[in-house]
Amino acid sequence: MASESRIAFWALLLVGCGASAPPFALKAPVTRDQDLDAINHSCKKNKKGEEECAPKMYESPFAWDGADNIVFRPLTRFFAVTPAGPAANVNALDELPDSSWFVNRIGSKPMTPEEVANGYCVEGDTLDPNDPDGSWVIDHGKDNGANPGFRVKSKGTKYMFKLDDGQIERATAATAIAARFYYAAGYWAPCDSVLYFRRSLLKLTPGLVIHPNVGKTVPLDEKRLDEMLQTTGRRGPLYRITASRWLPGVAVGPFTYAGRRDDDPSDTVPHEDRRDLRGAKIMAAWLNHFDTREQNTMSTWMSEDPKHENSTPGHVQHWIIDLGDCFGSQWAQDAIWQRLGYSNVFDWGDIGYDFITLGAVEEPWDRGVINPDGDIFGYYRTPDFVPDSWKPEYPNPAFGRMQEDDAAWGTRILARFTPDHIKAVVHIGDFTNPKHEEFLVKTLLERQAILLKRYFKKLSPIADVRVTPKGELCGTDLARKTNTYDAGTFKYRAVYQPWDGAPTQVNVASGPDGDVCIDTPVRPDVYKMGPEDVHRHGVYKIWNGASEGPLVVHVRDVSAAAGERNNTVVGIERPKG
């Protein structure tokens, strides 16, 4: 009876569609954003008389970014109510076009575990630990960031060397592992690789300094270099680091999680309204990448002429970098360390709640324990992980505007990572203790399952919608493919609504690996209609029995002869139930 009532409801709702134009036109969905097109940028001469055509460097003060997002932005938002609406860069298929921010990778085509484990490192040079002594020249100290480091130049290529600090092997592994997950998901993330090397390879350029997040600038001399190396992992005489290959192009500063870049005419969507940035909260929660401040991003000017990086035309590309905080980064204050991922460092709501309750109510962070099998990962764990409650170090403007459909989009991508993918990527961390690798794989799989169970519950997880050569309308139910819910939960049903008629139930066939197919009906007279006739439009609604909302697929029947069944998918919606 409940099923019949729901069908009757959709019948009444859809009957009203006949008087209006279909919501999706018969045209190919946007699959490539215009921000990848090269633009001409004004040039200027530097002090050496050389032309520089890249946009001006944006400086992002560490203290200001924190103060702005903790104090000033919340106050501004409180007095100027701007409720978050739908993301502004979504195409007709409820997906994202490839852009300078995001490229569809594992979410649009299968990737092997090896491909995921390679990440961005498949392109470009790599360091050789067998190089001669003194051939790795240190030419710059590492500015900002939670972990110590310095820049090295070898054979014309630059690398940022990042070291462990306290939690031996965690930070160096984290940045290499997380970068591969982000890259496979679709973000631009660097080639970060764990490396063991001998001290004699390094040659220090005199007069270098380090600009830390807080405190005074300090010299980078031989003494300080040795002190830094003492904090990182060792295997006999070899030191452990993460080598982060220098990004291509000309660095023009971090990107912001709100607003637009004034000197980039292709940057047309407010960053807080980009689905790729909103939905990035799913990846961050999975990995506990709490340090999502803008200083851990970078934008680069990508000239059309790779031999002249500072020339025009070109475009601005956006990167997520410095992921060493993932998997339980330690803070000096244990009380703050325990809260990371559960509360902002300065959380107005939690402070007020603690004040009212006098701290008598047990919070999730109060239950935190360090697992002896994963001691280097601190409080990174599965118990008490609640996706809706996860928080970064301080408020992130894009994360704060994430809607259910943005989260569902990010979760559909997360679901593509199989256990084999995760094992292959974690193995890149090169842990000395096998228990650490086992713990991290286990925790990632558990947290992934929690995220899938939460965000596949409200909106349909059916993806990869396509029309087969036989004329069937098929998709892949990612919830069933990943065994997110019990097998008995999945009970498929569907209705078809022609633009000019009443809805009818249609048969649904479910196959292995989450496959779902509908045998679409032949419309005998549709071939007589004009190509733009609205009556060629039809709507399929598919429920999987596990998710509250249906998958809504808009099709155009472009049949040109009697007896044909030639549907084209023109739009996809995932409404709430």
Question: How does the language model describe each region?
Answer:
Residues 258-295:
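Conserved kinase catalytic-core helix
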Residues 295-305:
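Catalytic-loop signature of eukaryotic-like protein kinases
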Residues 483-508, 538-543:
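Extended low-complexity, serine/threonine- and proline-enriched intrinsically disordered segments
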